[in-house]
């Protein structure tokens, strides 16, 4: 720094070569010194710049951290605002729906009120009509009161008529009871009649069977009689040889061919039995 302000007069240059050499050395030394000073100045300037940059970097780092924190806060605030916006939107839509439903309900109520207004007019006309009808009925009631006052002396006859009506009602009830009994009896008789028809059909079938058996027995009896009449008369000697055995066989003393007579009697007894059986069944059915 001191070499920069030094001044060398021009007369000293021409003194001698030694002085020139010395001067050149001094100049070179001054130049080197100036270079070192310049380098030192540059280094100092760069150091200051670096220090300033470091300070700026620290400030920027602090500002970056602050901005980052502010950004996080802003993000959280934005999320909260978004949630609030969603809630507000949902609430708004719900309110809109509610308002719409209320509008529909109020419109329906308005229509109902319009209908009620028409019904109210009809009711008013009906009330007026009923008022006129009431007046007419009051007039008729007054007329009826007059007629009842006129008919009051005949109240004894009305009581007798009421008694006769009650008697007639009792007779009608008895007639209805008799009619119900007649219906039940008719149904029971119809049931018994159907049972009787079934029994008669069964008896007719049995009679047909018995008649067939009787015809068969009569045929057999006639065949037995014919066989007995066609048989030869035994000789006296043969009868004597057999003695009482012949009487035992033919029943003795004029009762010849007892088997044929017995068969005929059996047929007659069966016929009478069948007729009695049919009669008894018919009597039981009619009684039942």
From Swiss-Prot:
Keywords: Activator, Coiled coil, Cytoplasm, Developmental protein, Differentiation, Flowering, Nucleus, Transcription, Transcription regulation. Its main location: cytoplasm. The keyword Cytoplasm applies. Residues 225-257 are annotated as: Disordered. Disruption phenotype: Early flowering. Decreased level of H3K4me3 and histone H3 and H4 acetylation in the region spanning the transcription-translation start site of FLC, but not of UFC or DFC. InterPro entries: FLX/FLX-like (IPR040353). Transactivator required for FRIGIDA-mediated activation of FLC and for the expression of the repressors of flowering AGL27/MAF1 and AGL31/MAF2. Does not alter expression of known activators of FLC expression. Not required for the photoperiod response or for the vernalization response. Not redundant with FLXL4. This is Protein FLC EXPRESSOR. The lineage of its organism: Eukaryota, Viridiplantae, Streptophyta, Embryophyta, Tracheophyta. The gene is FLX.
């Amino acid at each position: 720094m001191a070499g920069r302000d030094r001044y060398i007069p021009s007369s000293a240059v021409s003194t001698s070569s030694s002085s020139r050499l010395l001067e050149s050395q001094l100049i070179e030394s001054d130049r080197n010194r100036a270079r070192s000073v310049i380098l030192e100045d540059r280094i100092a300037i760069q150091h200051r710049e670096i220090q300033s940059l470091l300070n700026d970097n620290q400030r920027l780092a602090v500002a970056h951290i602050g901005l980052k924190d502010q950004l996080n806060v802003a993000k959280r605030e934005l999320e909260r605002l978004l949630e609030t916006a969603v809630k507000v939107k949902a609430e708004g839509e719900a309110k809109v729906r509610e308002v719409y439903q209320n509008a529909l309900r109020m419109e329906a109520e308005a229509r109902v009120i319009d209908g009620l207004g028409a019904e109210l007019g009809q009711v008013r006309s009906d009330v007026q009509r009923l008022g006129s009808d009431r007046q007419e009925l009051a007039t008729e009631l007054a007329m009826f009161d007059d007629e009842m006052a006129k008919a009051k002396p005949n109240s004894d006859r009305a009581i007798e008529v009421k008694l006769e009506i009650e008697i007639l009602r009792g007779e009608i009830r008895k007639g209805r009871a008799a009619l119900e009994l007649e219906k039940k009896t008719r149904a029971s008789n119809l049931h018994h009649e159907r049972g009787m028809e079934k029994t008669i059909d069964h008896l007719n079938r049995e009679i047909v069977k018995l008649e067939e058996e009787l015809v068969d027995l009569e045929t057999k009896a006639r065949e037995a009689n014919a066989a007995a009449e066609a048989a030869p008369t035994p000789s006296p000697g043969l009868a004597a040889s057999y003695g009482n055995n012949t009487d035992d066989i033919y029943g003795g003393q004029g009762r010849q061919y007892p088997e044929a007579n017995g068969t005929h009697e059996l047929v007659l007894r069966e016929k009478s039995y069948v007729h009695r059986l049919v009669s008894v069944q018919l009597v039981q059915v009619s009684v039942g």
